[in-house]
Amino acid sequence: MTPEITAEFVWSHIPKRPRESNKGSFGAVLAVAGSACYRGAASLTVEGALRTGAGIVTLASVEPVLAAVSARLPECCLCPCEPGAEGGISPQSIPRILRQKATVLLIGPGLGYLAPVSYTHLTLPT
């Protein structure tokens, strides 16, 4: 028989965080997301990362996206990028993006179909 999913059931399955922990104890997400036309994609991406327990979330994007996301989610760290084609991120921003510290790299939501910055351009140092 399938158990009834109640608030009590859900809370009983969420791991407890140690008292002596801090946001740096729970990973750092770097989201390369959004463009002038797709601001909501970046916002939903950041919100999802924060809600699922990421300690620090940094959004690398263009200014219109950063402004929209920071107004809604002030706990998000920002990595301003130069605008490129179609309101997306310019490849000139790649060095700045790669300097960010992260344990998880998320690329793509809202970059657009003509995005000059893609996974093939970005790797995280090990």
Describe the role of every protein-language-model region:
Residues M1-L122:
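Small-residue (G/A/S/T)-rich helix-start motifs and N-terminal tracts that mark the onset
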